[in-house]
């Protein structure tokens, strides 16, 4: 589900460059902690992997489960709001079995004046496209960090693996179950897709934890990469990733991607 929140500032609100997601993180966390019981708060804001192997068919080594939402707020970066100024952002919700939208609405209404909430159902067909596609461009619209010893955002197998695994994990925890696919086979076929053009730059951003005082890097690569090969099978995962985000800190607005189908160059 995609939800657009429109609010008006009650006081001066600053969104430093690259930090809009962190500002919303602080506001949402404080409001939810005060409004919800510990169990509901943990489910939304601090889901922990309580049982080994609980995510069947998904990636191993998860010490914390992904949160059941992703915020899209890049347009707020660098803005300074005065009292009464309107602003908006989008929250993609992945857990529709609980009252997450009500909790979010209550929390943001405590932080600012709530004007409206518009919601729309989102469905992505994960079946391969029927028509062949041989060249695509993936735009990394917000800083994207893909942790891998095998490569980074310009390497298609790495990008595809992160997008596929995030979709499967979210389905396992909050939806109908993990992807029923041959993960190894998908990975093998993804290796045949080659990077033919890449214009990426690194954006350095840090946030300071209020709880520990430590600084954490939340930057990543922005720009685009173009890939060539038999990519029709993989497009649904990339389309889903445009809603879920991909890579580190995608809950807070990082890892926002958009995929375009290109005409092959001969």
Question: What is each of the regions a protein language model found here?
Answer:
Residues 1-266:
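RNA-interacting cores
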